[in-house]
């Protein structure tokens, strides 16, 4: 199997294609991407027969920025007979995957696919029963086995394949289902909440998003991101010339500092989190983030990089490479991840976690 399907935000197919082509080549997997504008997905086709399997096994899904999901597929099933769509799908999956732990019948995230989504929901139950009977699925859901994907691109027209549960998005269609909290000051709050779900394993939340931590929000007004930190009982310094929502100030957990986020320097050395969602050139934001990390002013950071109109993948890659180079130069070991989240628009969200510094005596090590 030489094809891989990647879901992405509609309008960002070219970026997703450029990224998978680049990162596949680093694994010595060569091929080409099929791109249809505003379709919400990309198909990468390798030149060697087992290239698809190699990518979903060896290319870390967490290293992809523009992909929401990644799975290997066989040939496109066309013109499924309306009276029996199940038999051809079961036949295609037999021999491709054994004892999958979960079934996801999905569509791309487009307006055109909304009607098709209703069909997928109804179709899932009888298809799951048939796949269990055929041995393609286990008799119970388990996260330890591969996920079986059936991806409809049109009525009666689908790709079938699988992903590995330790190297995929755990979410249906690659989208976390989050509800906007009615008391949050702005919808941007969902970006940070989604970032926590994507970048921080659920079993580490109690330790890394803990009560009583100190956090800084640069460019905080009106407080959408501060809201998420307050909700987790952190003490937050919100830095912005613009006013904060009164509901946040009333909690007593927020200190509003009326100054420019680029000029602010912290006066304490135990800041666990710095978050930043400022509308500014990505290179300028990347330089500021690198400064915070190199100086040990925070342990972890989540920030947004606004994307230019063209060469978006190249721009983000340069920004991340700059941050990595600064960390390397100063002997700081860190994990860097970036993803265009479902709640992001013309931007990507980056998470950096300092692990240790080669040189002792930084502010966060005293």
Swiss-Prot record:
Residues binding S-adenosyl-L-methionine: 188, 221-224, 240, 260, 277
InterPro entries per UniProt: RlmM_FDX (IPR040739), RlmM_THUMP-like (IPR048646), RNA_MeTrfase_FtsJ_dom (IPR002877), rRNA_MeTrfase_M (IPR011224), SAM-dependent_MTases_sf (IPR029063)
One Pfam entry name: FtsJ
GO CC field: cytoplasm
Disulfide bridge map: none
Reaction(s) catalysed (UniProt annotation): cytidine(2498) in 23S rRNA + S-adenosyl-L-methionine = 2'-O-methylcytidine(2498) in 23S rRNA + S-adenosyl-L-homocysteine + H(+)
Gene3D superfamilies: 3.30.2300.20, 3.30.70.2810, Vaccinia Virus protein VP39 (3.40.50.150)
Keywords: Cytoplasm, Methyltransferase, rRNA processing, S-adenosyl-L-methionine, Transferase
SUPFAM superfamilies reported in the protein's UniProt record: S-adenosyl-L-methionine-dependent methyltransferases (SSF53335)
EC primary class: transferase
This enzyme's EC code(s): 2.1.1.186
Keyword Cytoplasm carried by entry: yes
Active site: 306 (proton acceptor)
rRNA processing in keyword set: yes
Protein family: Belongs to the class I-like SAM-binding methyltransferase superfamily. RNA methyltransferase RlmE family. RlmM subfamily.
Function of the protein: Catalyzes the 2'-O-methylation at nucleotide C2498 in 23S rRNA.
UniProt-recorded name of the protein: Ribosomal RNA large subunit methyltransferase M
